[in-house]
């Protein structure tokens, strides 16, 4: 009996072989976990180098470049670049298919319904919609961002990937929450983009500072600008009017400006009219759906007919005339050599002095045919140099060639001389592409030449001691739909339209401005059948190019 308790007492003290194995297995598992942990902390081969977005070279494919730059910048959940969907005609479902009941076995499962639900909400995720060129499926033509806030981070990435898009033509930002800071950043990246970028649309982005006029700076290349639904008030209209033109400078690139659906009143319309006084590039202007009444309408109509110059404008006109007269005198044939370089002037002076000395020697040897002119030349040394240069250049054929070169150099800036140079010097060097685009370039040169002439230098009319400048005949399209204009404002537009119709009748030059071709005054505070409105429509109907073309097609068909 004593042996049994001894056996029972010693049994728990002796270690079991199974327990030793289990503890050994635990230690092995712990060592393995530690090894795995240390192995997981080690960086993989090839990923120890940091990815710097500055080192990335854009390929010109916006989808690839934008995703790579966002990844390198640490941007995880970034918008995707997708192709803008085309507007398709919705097909009406048939009655047989719409009336069929949905059976229980035909209903989607839980997984299918979840995936379909996610696909539906993908529409609301931020995306960058692009419109591609038809010839090149990867070349982005237009960019559309709609309904999500664009921050400085995204604009910084755009500043790196947008310059590589060689075919980019338009950027459209609709309700993207722009601020004055982000607008400044956006304007700074526009010069980095391709020269093909001509259209910018910022709609639904109200900014308290009303700083949209920064888009119309002197160095801006924007041709078409849309600022609809931005809560632009009279203060914003004042900034936009000053961006259109002032006494010192004017915008020469903007062709169309859309200011519809804003809060511009009579005061703001007056500021826009002041900008149109000396602006000769804007062709298309929309002020529809604003708060313009008769006072603002009369200010706009006044610009379209001869208007009186203010005192400051008269003073500036006199200054410009003085500068123009000085330039014309400096470009005259007698003093054309003074426009050349210093070396050429010194050379011409030495040639003139040598000619004078030769004439003096010949006077001592023999009498000349024109002694009176020579005696006059001796009295004034400056006239001696100029006239003897002409005499020397006319005596020998070798001196006649440099005279033509000097005349060509002195005539730089004129219209005729560059045409001669293009026809002689560049005709043999022109390629096929240059020949193809020569008409477009010539049209651009003509437009630039007309724009470069300051409107204050146009022919004026003096009446009752006042100076009147011809009205703005460059503006072709004016939209004043849905404002608060009455028949009082209509009278002003009737006078302006009658003047423009009378002036544009004698077509002396095909390059002359056509004047107003389209005017919309519908949905205002007057009867559409009132005599003034009917008369305006009758005067504008033959001038509308769209309706005139339709009438020509109908006449040709009959």
UniProtKB/Swiss-Prot annotation:
Residues 28-38, 339-348, 380-391 have a biased composition (Basic and acidic residues). Keywords: Leucine-rich repeat, Repeat. InterPro entries: Leu-rich_rpt, LRR-containing_protein_71, LRR_dom_sf. Residues 86-99 have a biased composition (Polar residues). Residues 1-18 have a biased composition (Low complexity). SMART domains: LRR_RI (SM00368). LRR repeats lie at residues 196-216, 221-241, 253-274, 281-302. This is Leucine-rich repeat-containing protein 71. It comes from Mus musculus (Mouse).
């Amino acid at each position: 009996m004593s042996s049994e308790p001894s056996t029972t007492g010693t049994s728990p003290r002796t270690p079991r072989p199974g327990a030793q194995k289990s503890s050994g297995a635990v230690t092995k598992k712990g060592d393995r976990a530690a090894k795995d942990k240390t192995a997981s902390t080690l960086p993989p081969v090839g990923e120890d180098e940091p990815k710097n977005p500055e080192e990335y070279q854009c390929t010109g494919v916006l989808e690839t470049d934008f995703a790579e730059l966002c990844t390198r910048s640490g941007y995880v959940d970034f918008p995707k670049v997708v192709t803008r969907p085309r507007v398709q005609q919705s097909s009406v479902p048939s009655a047989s298919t719409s009336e069929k009941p949905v059976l229980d076995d035909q209903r989607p499962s839980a997984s299918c319904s979840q995936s379909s639900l996610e696909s539906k909400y993908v529409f609301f995720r931020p995306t960058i919609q692009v419109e591609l060129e038809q010839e090149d499926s990867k070349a982005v033509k237009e960019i559309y961002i709609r309904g999500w806030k664009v921050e400085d981070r995204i604009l910084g990435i755009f500043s790196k990937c947008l310059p590589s898009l060689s075919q980019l033509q338009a950027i459209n930002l609709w309700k993207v929450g722009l601020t004055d800071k982000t607008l400044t950043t956006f304007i700074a990246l526009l010069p980095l983009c391709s020269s093909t970028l001509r259209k910018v649309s910022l709609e639904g982005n109200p900014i308290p500072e009303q700083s949209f006029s920064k888009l119309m700076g002197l160095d801006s290349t924007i041709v078409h600008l849309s600022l609809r639904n931005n809560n632009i008030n009279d203060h914003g209209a004042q900034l936009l009017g000053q961006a259109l033109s002032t006494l010192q400078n004017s915008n020469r690139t903007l062709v169309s400006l859309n200011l519809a659906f804003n809060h511009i009143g009579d005061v703001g319309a007056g500021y826009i009219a002041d900008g149109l006084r000396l602006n000769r590039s804007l062709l298309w202007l929309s002020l529809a759906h604003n708060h313009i009444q008769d006072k603002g309408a009369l200010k706009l109509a006044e610009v379209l007919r001869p208007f009186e110059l203010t005192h400051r404008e008269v003073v500036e006109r006199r200054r410009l005339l003085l500068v123009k007269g000085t330039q014309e005198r400096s470009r005259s044939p007698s003093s054309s050599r003074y426009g050349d370089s210093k070396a050429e002037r010194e050379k011409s002076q030495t040639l003139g002095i040598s000619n004078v000395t030769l004439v003096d020697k010949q006077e001592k040897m023999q009498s000349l045919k024109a002694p009176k002119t020579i005696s006059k030349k001796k009295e004034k040394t400056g006239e001696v140099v100029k006239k003897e240069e002409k005499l020397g250049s006319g005596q020998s054929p070798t001196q006649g060639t440099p005279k033509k070169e000097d005349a060509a150099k002195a005539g730089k800036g004129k219209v005729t001389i560059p045409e001669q140079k293009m026809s002689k010097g560049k005709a043999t060097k022109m390629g096929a592409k240059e020949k193809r685009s020569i008409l477009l370039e010539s049209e651009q040169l003509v437009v630039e030449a007309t724009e470069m002439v300051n409107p204050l230098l146009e022919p004026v009319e003096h009446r009752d001691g006042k100076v009147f400048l011809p009205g703005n005949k460059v503006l072709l399209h004016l939209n004043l739909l849905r404002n608060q204009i009455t028949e009082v404002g209509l009278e002003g537009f009737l006078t302006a339209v009658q003047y423009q119709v009378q002036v544009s009748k004698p077509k002396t030059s095909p390059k002359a401005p056509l004047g107003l071709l389209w005017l919309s005054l519908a949905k205002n505070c007057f009867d559409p059948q009132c005599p003034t409105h009917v008369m305006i429509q009758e005067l504008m109907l033959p001038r509308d190019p769209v309706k005139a073309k339709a009438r020509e097609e109908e006449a040709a068909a009959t």
